[in-house]
Amino acid sequence: MNFYKIKILILISFIVFSATLESQIVDIETSRKEDLVGTKISLNLGFDGSSGTVDRTNYSIGTRFDFNNEVWNRFLIFNYSRREKDERINEDNTFLHLRFARKISSIIAAEFFIQTNEKPLEKIEERNHIVKGRRHSPIKNLRLGVGLFDENEKRINLDERNTVRANTYLNYLFNISNNTSINT
């Protein structure tokens, strides 16, 4: 069996294995900028609309702040989006994530984050997480993590719910070629 076929077989195995696992409660792996040292700030604004048979208005705002040094990785992400069709709102989402990760060694990091989001059209008035965790990177592109979540959820027309839960995750960045990869 040649090397190309082995890569395809491994890729299919990761996809099947990932589909059978329960997904992370908070998936932020693709948002990490671990190799960045220094400060980076980005701001995204979006607006589009159309008028005619159907009137549509969509707008969004997103910002990200990264403050990293050799020991600490810190970032803040904020997103808001709203979509309307014929004066009816069909999306109105707010998301805020603040994370601190401290490198303990070359393969271990301790993490803390707070996250809040609101999705009133999905009956989520407010969902807040406070999380402490530990992350291991035993080999390049592999991340293993465990976290303890304190979750508070307020749903529209339902009682408020507090939950403490543990979360584990496995994340692997599978490189197919120099400019193509899949994050599982």
Where are these regions (language model features)?
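Residues on the lipid-exposed face of transmembrane beta-strands in outer-membrane beta-barrel proteins
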Residues: 43-47, 61-67, 98-102, 132-136, ...
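Repeated loop/turn-to-beta-strand initiation elements of outer-membrane beta-barrel proteins
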Residues: 39, 70-76, 107-110, 140-144, ...
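Membrane-embedded beta-strand positions of outer-membrane beta-barrel proteins
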Residues: 43-45, 76-78, 112, 132, ...
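Cleavable N-terminal export/targeting peptides
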Residues: 1-36
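Outer-membrane beta-barrel transmembrane domain signature
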Residues: 143-184
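Short glycine/proline- and aromatic-enriched beta-strand/turn motifs that initiate or cap beta-hairpins
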Residues: 25-73
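Transmembrane beta-strands of outer-membrane beta-barrel pores
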Residues: 47-51, 67-69, 80-84, 114-120, ...
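Residues that define the transmembrane beta-barrel architecture of outer-membrane proteins
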Residues: 37-39, 55-59, 90-94, 126-130, ...
